[in-house]
Structure formats: structure tokens, C-alpha cells
């Protein structure tokens, strides 16, 4: 199977890995930088505390993303870089998860709501991550096979940030 032009193991083999909050094998195991949205309306705030509460309610021990970027561009880190996340099963052992606040318009429909501050912060973060993990592909959650029919991150991550 190919993702972003990269050959990966079968989805069945990826699913066999347990996502348990342990560390990944090495920096070389990072193959994807996955952009997510919080799937919240652009006119409503979604704090780190709300995100944490919602992720714990889903059975995660904490926030599943490595990074969360608020509408004002404030970024918080919630997992160590080589810690297995909980954001894109079955790809958690080979990816870094980045979530931006938003993704829905005022009516609750999928929409690219990335603010200029978020765009700048995401670009800065991805530039650093690409230096650390040069082989990693920048993709949206919806671009990973087996995760459809998701619309997340409600934009074309590869087109916006993959250059």
C-alpha cells in the first residue's frame, strides 16, 4: 500500500501494533506528520482542558495529539516526540499528530478555518519536524487509508504545507 508516495506495510499489520503510550522504535520510524482539526466550530473556543476531557472520555490517558494549536496561534505539546500518540489508528506508531482548533464553520460544516496565526505556527512546527524527520510525509488525517470517510483536517494538508 502507498501513502503519499511511500510504501507502507499492510493495514492489517499496522493494526497489530498496540497503541499504549510507549515510545516508538526510533526517529526513523516517523513516516508521517499528520494534520488534524478539532472538528469544532470556528466561532466557539475549544480549550486544552476541553480537549483533554474529551480524549480521556474516549479512553486515552491524556490528549492523543503531540501538538495542539489554538486559533490565536498558541501551541501546546502533549506527547513527547517519540511517544506513541492516539490520533490516527493504526498509524500512531509511525506518525506525529498535530491538531488545530476549528475545522467547522458556524453551521457545523467542514471548512478550512485555519487562522493566519495557526497557519504560521503550523508552518514553523512542520519546518522543525521535517528537519528532525526528513523522510516524513505531511498528510491530513483523511489522507491515510482506513481512516475515511473522515474530512479531517477539513483542508488539503499536503497542498497547504507539504511543499
Give residue ranges: language-model regions.
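Basic/polar, cationic surfaces and motifs that engage anionic cell-wall
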Residues: 1-34, 38, 42, 71-75, ...
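A short acidic/small-residue loop/turn micro-motif
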Residues: 83-84
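Short Gly/aromatic-enriched secondary-structure transition segments
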Residues: 47-55
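Short solvent-exposed loop/turn micro-motifs enriched in small/polar/acidic residues
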Residues: 60-61
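Short glycine-biased active-site loop of nucleotidyltransferases that positions the nucleotide triphosphate
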Residues: 87-90
